[in-house]
Structure formats: structure tokens, C-alpha cells
Amino acid sequence: MSANGRSILLVDDDQEIRELLETYLSRAGFQVRSVSRGADFRQALCEEEASLAILDVMLPDEDGFSLCRWIRSHQRLACMPIIMLTASSDEADRVIGLELGADDYLGKPFSPRELLARIKALLRRAQFTQVRGGDVLAFEDWRLDTVSHRLFHEDGEEFFLSGADFALLKLFLDHPQQILDRDTIANATRGREVLPLERIVDMAVSRLRQRLRDTGKAPRLIQTVRGSGYLLAAQVRPHLQP
């Protein structure tokens, strides 16, 4: 399985789901490899990259949250889109997954057709950011590398942004000093949501503010425009390498 934009690695301890998705996604033109344990998932990604990961939350040896965290902590894997699956109806599970950097979340039972649509949407978004990338954008005390998804502060701190966090910051940088409503933010950062739109957008903005050290009662960089949405109150410019 090669990371050619059409390869998927799935981990789920339900054999019927694995077989169903292997068949369905293969017919849609994807190369699919599936495993039943977290340890096997880690080994598979160490051996060969994938274009997208599908993680079941509940596994025999560990949970999908730890796998999501592990992916986002590795430079080689940090930008890979992640979809999480869960049989739980607990909203807290979904919030945790998204906060850890998952790009989308789907509850069981689910429609393979809907999963396929979400996979295609995430891969299109990943490809789009790669095509448009190449520049380093500077704003305030920060620089964003739009290819590697790395965010740098002038004090030397740097870290990787998950797909959702990167998409949100890139949206603000593409529209500086413009009010963006919640619909615009939701549509740009991920497709259909498993949580109420207002909740998911506010949570995503809050997470990005923490990354940018823009916390407190009156955030200065990403400002809330009451009744309208959010605004990036900063000048954005290309960063010229010395």
C-alpha cells in the first residue's frame, strides 16, 4: 500500500466492519489495509505510509484516542487526515477526538456511502492545501509553513497543526481582518458535523486561540464579533527567507 492519495489504513476490532469497508472502499478505487489492534496499526504505519487513517475508538489493546495523539506527534504522519469511528453516543468522546486532532467523526452504525463521501472530502482538502502551499505566511509573532503545517513563534517554539487546526488558521490567514461567520468556518474546516455547528466552531476557535497564546477574557488576535462570527485582527504577509 503506497501513500498515493488513495491508500487507507483502518483499525477496528469488528471483523464484519473491516471486511465491509475493505470491499466497499476497494470498489471505489482505494487501496485498503485493515488491522484489529492498535499495535498492528502502529506497525503498519511504520512500515508504509497511508493517505488517510480510520480509527475505531474502542480497541482490545488501546483506544483510538491514543492512536490519534500518536499520529499527530510524529512529523512524518502529522498531516495525515484522520476519521474516528465510535459506537458510543457520548458527546464527550467526540469532543475528545476532535480536540486531539481528528478531522472527522462518524458514529456507528454508519452508512459506507457517507463514510466514502467524508473520505473524499478530506483527501480533496489535503490535496488542495498541498497544491496551494509553498509559502510561509507571517502574522504578528508567528509564521505558518503551509506545506509542512508547522507553526513557528519568534521565541523558537514550533509545533505541527492537525488537519482541522491548520485549515482553520489558513482560512483566517486567507481572509485577514474580515468577519467569518460560523457557516463559512464549518464549511472550510470540515464537512458535515457530528456536533451542533455552533458548538464545534466555537470549540475549534478556542483550540486555535490556545495554540496562538491568544487566551483571556478578550482575545486580541482572533476576535469574537458578537452576533456575526470571528475576525483575525492581524496583518498577514509572505515571510521572506533570509
Swiss-Prot record:
GO cellular component, one term: cytosol
Localization per Swiss-Prot or TrEMBL: Cytoplasm
Domain Response regulatory: 7-123
Effects seen without this gene: Disruption of the gene causes loss of glucose transport activity. Inactivation results in elevated ingestion and reduced cytotoxicity of eukaryotic cells during P.aeruginosa infection.
Keyword Methyltransferase among record annotations: no
A Gene Ontology molecular function term of the record: transcription cis-regulatory region binding
PROSITE patterns for this protein: OMPR_PHOB, RESPONSE_REGULATORY
Chief site of localization: cytoplasm
Modifications made to the protein after synthesis: Phosphorylated by GtrS.
Record entry for activity regulation: Phosphorylation of GltR induces its dissociation from DNA leading to transcriptional activation.
GO biological process: positive regulation of D-glucose transmembrane transport; regulation of DNA-templated transcription
DNA-binding region: 134-234
Assigned keywords, A-Z: Cytoplasm, DNA-binding, Phosphoprotein, Repressor, Transcription, Transcription regulation, Two-component regulatory system
Protein name per Swiss-Prot or TrEMBL: Transcriptional regulatory protein GltR
Species for this entry: Pseudomonas aeruginosa (strain ATCC 15692 / DSM 22644 / CIP 104116 / JCM 14847 / LMG 12228 / 1C / PRS 101 / PAO1)
Upper classification of the organism: Bacteria, Pseudomonadati, Pseudomonadota, Gammaproteobacteria, Pseudomonadales
Designated gene of the protein: gltR
